[in-house]
């Protein structure tokens, strides 16, 4: 079998809309640049711009880096003939917090108890109420009474989950995962005015070294999720046991870039993706 050639093969970096792209523009364009270095014909595609060439671009792409947190734009053909990063299962599990909870429980990983929002599911206060598709700390609320829930903009309760408030939640850890391997881990500490430890909302961040048994647990979770680039957000209880909070599909890298300015994260990501992509293409040729 001859060498797999990448020249002029079509690749897409997909974002949902212009605002999302502009927020992550440096990262997105760096991904494009690294793909072009590998001789691929790469471009950014926004899902909100469904022009006459939209379907053709999706169908022609052999490699799609899906940063949109959505899968409904992909066809059956893409599932078979396109190398997707992240794959369907990661996108589906990570972008619905109730599905994340169910998947973690099914696989017997410790996580924060979650249930669909209703009067019956709240036994005591305070609680955390969050939208199932929220990310970046948006639509996440600390609620101290039933009256406070009434003042939230909730139209459909089934789109929201409720969790117990954990005192350890002001310190959160994020493991950046690339095809089952841990790139780096950061520690996030919420500022005095916040109960959530999000970098985009002013959390203090630092690099963190995992103990061997914690690393083993994170790798076990990553192995079950399989391939892709994503992040696992977790807490550590007083026994240093991992309690998974969320799985971040379109994981941002701003905190990592700030802490590791010499780490070319997009180069590492694309180098690994290209290696996997070549294996995918070889497998297609054989079959």
UniProtKB/Swiss-Prot annotation:
Would you kindly state one Gene Ontology biological process term found in this protein's UniProt entry? SOS response
Q: Which Gene3D superfamilies match?
A: ATP-grasp fold, A domain, ATP-grasp fold, B domain
Instruction: Extract one GO cellular component term from the record.
Output: cytoplasm
The source's superkingdom equals: Bacteria
GO function terms (MF aspect): ATP binding; metal ion binding; ribosomal S6-glutamic acid ligase activity
Pfam entry (one): RimK
Task: List each copy of the ATP-grasp domain by range.
Answer: 115-287
> Which PANTHER family does this one have?
BETA-CITRYLGLUTAMATE SYNTHASE B-RELATED, RIBOSOMAL PROTEIN S6 MODIFICATION PROTEIN
The name under which this protein is listed is Uncharacterized protein MG011
Q: Which organism is it from?
A: Mycoplasma genitalium (strain ATCC 33530 / DSM 19775 / NCTC 10195 / G37) (Mycoplasmoides genitalium)
């Amino acid at each position: 079998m001859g060498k797999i050639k990448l020249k002029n093969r079509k690749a897409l970096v997909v974002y949902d809309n212009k605002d999302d792209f502009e927020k992550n523009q440096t990262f997105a364009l760096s991904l494009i640049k690294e793909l072009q270095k590998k001789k691929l014909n790469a471009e950014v595609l926004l899902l909100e711009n469904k022009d006459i060439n939209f379907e053709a671009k999706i169908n022609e792409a052999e490699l799609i880096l899906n940063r949109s947190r959505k899968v409904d734009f992909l066809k059956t053909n893409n599932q078979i003939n396109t190398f997707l990063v992240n794959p369907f299962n990661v996108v589906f599990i990570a972008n619905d917090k109730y599905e994340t909870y169910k998947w973690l429980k099914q696989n017997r990983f410790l996580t924060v108890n979650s249930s669909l929002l209703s009067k019956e599911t709240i036994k005591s206060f305070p609680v955390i109420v969050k939208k199932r598709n929220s990310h970046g700390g948006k639509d996440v609320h600390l609620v101290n009474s039933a009256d406070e829930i009434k003042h939230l903009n909730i139209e459909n309760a089934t789109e929201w989950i409720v969790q117990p408030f954990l005192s350890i939640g002001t310190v959160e850890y994020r493991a950046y995962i690339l095809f089952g391997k841990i790139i780096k881990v950061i520690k996030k500490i919420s500022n005095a005015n916040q109960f959530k430890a999000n970098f985009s909302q002013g959390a203090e961040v630092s690099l963190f070294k995992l103990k061997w048994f914690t690393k083993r647990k994170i790798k076990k979770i990553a192995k079950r999720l399989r391939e892709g680039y994503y992040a696992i957000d977790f807490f550590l209880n007083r026994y240093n046991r991992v309690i998974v909070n969320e799985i971040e599909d379109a994981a941002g890298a701003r905190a990592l870039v700030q802490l590791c300015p010499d780490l070319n994260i997009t180069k590492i990501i694309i180098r690994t993706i290209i290696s996997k992509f070549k294996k995918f293409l070889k497998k297609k040729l054989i079959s």
